[in-house]
Regions:
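Phosphate/ribose-recognition catalytic cores of enzymes acting on nucleotide-derived substrates
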Residues: 166-181
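Intrinsically disordered, low-complexity, charged terminal extensions of DNA damage-control enzymes
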Residues: 1-47
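Acidic, metal-coordinating catalytic segment for phosphate/diphosphate chemistry
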Residues: 39-90
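N-terminal strand-loop-strand
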Residues: 1-14, 73-113, 141-145, 177
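Short, well-ordered beta-strand micro-motif
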Residues: 52, 91, 172-176, 196-199
Length: 230
């Protein structure tokens, strides 16, 4: 994945995100502070993400350090290095906000997450978000702005049992569903056990994964407030 930084309409930074590198850290080292994501797209088979930045100031604190959590620190097995770019959506409708429940194959079974997942090779992020939402929930969505870019790095087991040195890059979009229905899981046997609509005012009563909770805390109120159902 490539990140392109823009300030006052001009591109001022561009880099490919290496394995385990966090975009906000890289920008800070290059003299920029990440303000917000702008858009994502596919260019010559590579996912590109544009972000708005500003010049770093002497008083700006560095982004918080993030350690690499190892779920099996005593293992002699060599983990497989895997960086995955995924597309996700905060989907709102008259029925609430759309969530999925993690299956027993995941690191956090029973927790709630945002619908979405890894992009296929050569897939545009917007197309991937729509595909993943349909596969996990059966809902057809209208995709809006890119609202968050998340980066996490850990060592643990995949749903297939492989020990991975895993770097997750998540592109989270706002979305609406004009014709909500009872969610149906089409992608069986994977990381998602089921899906459901959660009333917006009750979303904090569910146990969400940390990435999902952070995204919802930062963006759900605004996304729901801008919908035609509020």
């Amino acid at each position: 994945m490539r990140v392109c930084g823009f300030s006052s309409g001009s591109q001022v930074a561009s880099f490919v995100v290496g394995h385990g590198q966090h975009p906000d850290h890289t920008l800070f080292r290059e003299g920029w502070v990440l303000l917000r994501p702008l858009r994502s797209r596919l260019v010559d088979g590579v996912v590109e993400v544009d972000v708005e930045v500003r010049r770093r100031r002497p008083q700006d604190p560095a982004p918080a350090a993030r350690s690499v959590h190892h779920e099996e620190p005593g293992s002699a097995e060599t983990p497989v290095v895997h960086q995955r770019v995924g597309a996700y959506a905060i989907v709102v409708s008259p029925w609430g906000v759309l969530g999925t429940v993690n299956s027993s194959l995941t690191r956090a079974p029973g927790t709630w997450a945002l619908p979405g997942g890894g992009l296929d090779a050569g897939e545009d992020p917007a197309d991937g978000a729509r595909r993943e939402v349909f596969e996990e929930t059966g809902q057809h969505i209208q995709l809006g702005d890119l609202v968050s870019v998340q980066s996490d790095h850990w060592i643990g087991r995949s749903v297939t049992g492989v020990l991975e040195d895993f770097h997750a890059l998540r592109l989270i979009h706002a979305a609406t569903c004009q014709t909500p229905s009872q969610p149906v899981l089409h992608d069986l046997g994977g990381s998602t056990e089921r899906a459901d609509w959660v009333p917006v005012e009750m979303w904090r009563q569910r146990r969400w994964t940390r990435p999902a909770f952070e995204a919802l805390s930062q963006h759900l109120e605004r996304i729901a407030g801008q919908s035609c159902w509020k």
